[in-house]
Regions:
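C-terminal PAP-associated
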Residues: 1-306
C-alpha cells in the first residue's frame, strides 16, 4: 500500500491507498478502508475494506473528502482519470455507519480543456555558488488529487498540478475545481499559471497545491512557486466567494526559499511538497492556515587546517 489519503464525515473516517505488486512495483488496484466513526470514538476501529478498485473505476488516488458538515451523510471521493480529456470521477460512500456502500461515480469532463500529465523532475530552481555541477530539477507533483479534497455547503473542491500547454508543455500550473456534489458536474474552477514560463526564462512554475474552504465559501490555495532564477518559494492565492467565477486574487509568496534543494534518497526523484496542506481554523471557521515547504540556507562549510 502506498500514499494514504484521508477523508471523513459524520459516519466514517476513510483512508484510501494505492496497491502495488511486490514483483515489479506495478499499480494493481485501489483500496479504501472505511471506519465506523461513532464506534471509532469509543476506541474501536474495525474497517470495512473496499478493494480491487481498478484505474478505470478511479481506484488510483481516490481521495476522500474532508467533510465540513454535521449532517452530510454521503462521503465523496474524487479520482482523476485522463489529463488530455480532462476527465474525473466523483464516487460515493453511503449507507449506515456500520454498513457502508461504495459506489463508483460516472465519468465526467472538467470544463476548460485538457492538459499534459505532470510529475518527474521538471520544475526549475536556481542555485548558489556552492551548488553541485548539475543542479537537479524538482518534482512538482502529478495530476492526481494527492493533498486533499474538501466538501463544503453542497460542493466538492480539489486542486492538482497540471502541465501546459497540453500539446507542447513548457511549465506547470495549479488548477482548482469546484463540483456540484449532488450531480458530480463541474461548477467552477480556474488556474494559477504564468503562460510565458519555461524551464530557463525565469517564468513562474506552480505545483503541489492544497485547498481550503471556509464557512463563507472563501477559498485558499497553498502551493509551491518555482523559477529558473530563484529558489522554491512557499506561496498561496485566495478568493472571496463574491469574486468573479474562475478567478483567484494575486499570488502571495509568504516565505522565500533560502537555498536550492537536492535530495532524492537514492530514488532519482526530487520529491517536494507531498504533504503540504491548507486548512480552516476551527476556532472561527473563517481564518486559513497553510503549511508549505521551502529549503533553508545551508550552513557554511567548516574550514580547518594546520
Amino acid at each position: 500500500a502506498d500514499f494514504p489519503m484521508l477523508g471523513y464525515n459524520k459516519n466514517w473516517v476513510a483512508i484510501s491507498v494505492n496497491m502495488f505488486t511486490v514483483a515489479g512495483s506495478a499499480f494493481s488496484s485501489g483500496s479504501v478502508f472505511v471506519v465506523d466513526y461513532p464506534t471509532l470514538r469509543t476506541g474501536i476501529a474495525s474497517p470495512t475494506v473496499f478493494s480491487g478498485i481498478s484505474s478505470a473505476s478511479g481506484g488510483f488516488c481516490a481521495h476522500p473528502a474532508e467533510t465540513y458538515s454535521s449532517s452530510e451523510a454521503t462521503l465523496y471521493l474524487v479520482s482523476h482519470l485522463s489529463s488530455g480529456s480532462a476527465t474525473y470521477k466523483l464516487s460515493t460512500i453511503t449507507g449506515t455507519a456500520a454498513a457502508p456502500v461504495y459506489t463508483v461515480g460516472a465519468t465526467n469532463t472538467r470544463t476548460g480543456g485538457g492538459w499534459a500529465t505532470s510529475g518527474g523532475n521538471i520544475m526549475p530552481q536556481t542555485c548558489t555558488s556552492s551548488c553541485p555541477g548539475t543542479l537537479a530539477l524538482i518534482d512538482p507533483g502529478d495530476q492526481f488529487h494527492r493533498n486533499n479534497v474538501v466538501f463544503r455547503n453542497g460542493f466538492v473542491w480539489y486542486a492538482q498540478t497540471i502541465r501546459l500547454p497540453s500539446s507542447t508543455p513548457t511549465h506547470t500550473a495549479v488548477q482548482w475545481t469546484k463540483l456540484t456534489a449532488s450531480t458530480g458536474l463541474f461548477s467552477d474552477g480556474g488556474r494559477i499559471e504564468d503562460p510565458t514560463a519555461t524551464a530557463t526564462n525565469g517564468g513562474k512554475w506552480y505545483g503541489h497545491p492544497s485547498i481550503a474552504v471556509n464557512k463563507n465559501n472563501d477559498v485558499l490555495l497553498g502551493f509551491t512557486e518555482g523559477e529558473s532564477d530563484d529558489f522554491l518559494d512557499a506561496a498561496y492565492a485566495f478568493r472571496l466567494s463574491t469574486d468573479a467565477a474562475g478567478t483567484m486574487q494575486d499570488v502571495v509568496v509568504f516565505k522565500d526559499g533560502e537555498d536550492y534543494y537536492e535530495k532524492d534518497f537514492g530514488s532519482g526523484r526530487q520529491r517536494w511538497g507531498d504533504y503540504s496542506h491548507a486548512v480552516v481554523d476551527p476556532s472561527d471557521d473563517v481564518t486559513f492556515w497553510t503549511i508549505q515547504e521551502y529549503a533553508k540556507l545551508r550552513a557554511a562549510p567548516t574550514v580547518g587546517g594546520s
